[in-house]
């Protein structure tokens, strides 16, 4: 709405941040009554809820297996912080029995459908960009704050741990003047977003004193 409403007045550089809550708040998904009853305080922050009544959430992904480490690993041989974190999560959001594979698969299906929902909303934003006439003059950055353990290594949510599942998130940059299709296998951080955006917008002629590194050279394979 902002893009369409203001497209004729955008005569100087602009930044639009579009933020989607889910799948971040997957911790409030209810896998069943057993999980709900095991919460230490059912009224803490928010109740657990089933998927929204939306066709996109009707898709069942239970034919896809859980992460391989879900069955292979247990918390017994993990560092203390893993077990402590799992206990806190169980207390706040309810316990999910590892033997209840159906509950974990339902949790995974909800997560996948949240991602599909985000894709649908991103399509709306891209369509608004095109309708506003700004699509070919806009740098688009798509990223996330963290991943989801989803049962990997016996954990869920993000956790005080560093695994591929919770630390490897998408960072996709589309630049109208740069050909796409390039994959760069280098580390980046959310701290790098501001200096990278400044570098892209000013073609590297301006820097900032904010933390982080300008990743814009990676667009051309540097």
Residue spans for each PLM region:
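Active-site-proximal cap/lid insertion segments
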Residues: 6-12, 20-137, 141-187, 200-207
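Short beta-strand/turn segments that mark the catalytic/cofactor-handling region
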Residues: 222
């Amino acid at each position: 709405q902002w893009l369409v409403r203001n497209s004729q007045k955008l005569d100087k550089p602009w930044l639009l941040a579009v933020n989607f809550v889910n799948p971040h708040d997957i911790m409030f998904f209810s896998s069943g009554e057993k999980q709900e009853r095991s919460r230490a305080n059912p009224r803490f922050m928010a109740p657990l809820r089933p998927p929204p009544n939306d066709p996109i959430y009707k898709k069942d992904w239970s034919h896809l297996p859980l992460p391989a480490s879900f069955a292979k690993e247990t918390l017994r041989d993990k560092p203390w912080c893993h077990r402590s974190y799992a206990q806190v999560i169980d207390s706040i959001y309810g316990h999910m029995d590892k033997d209840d594979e159906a509950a974990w698969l339902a949790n995974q299906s909800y997560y996948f459908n949240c991602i599909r929902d985000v894709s649908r909303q991103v399509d709306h934003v891209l369509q608004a960009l095109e309708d506003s006439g700004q699509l070919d003059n806009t740098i688009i950055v798509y990223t996330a704050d963290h991943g989801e353990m989803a049962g990997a290594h016996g954990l869920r949510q993000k956790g005080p741990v560093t695994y591929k599942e919770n630390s490897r998130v998408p960072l996709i940059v589309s630049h109208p003047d740069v050909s796409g299709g390039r994959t760069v296998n280098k580390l980046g951080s959310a701290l790098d977003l501001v200096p990278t955006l400044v570098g892209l917008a000013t073609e590297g002629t301006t820097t900032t004193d904010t933390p982080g590194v300008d990743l814009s050279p990676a667009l051309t394979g540097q």
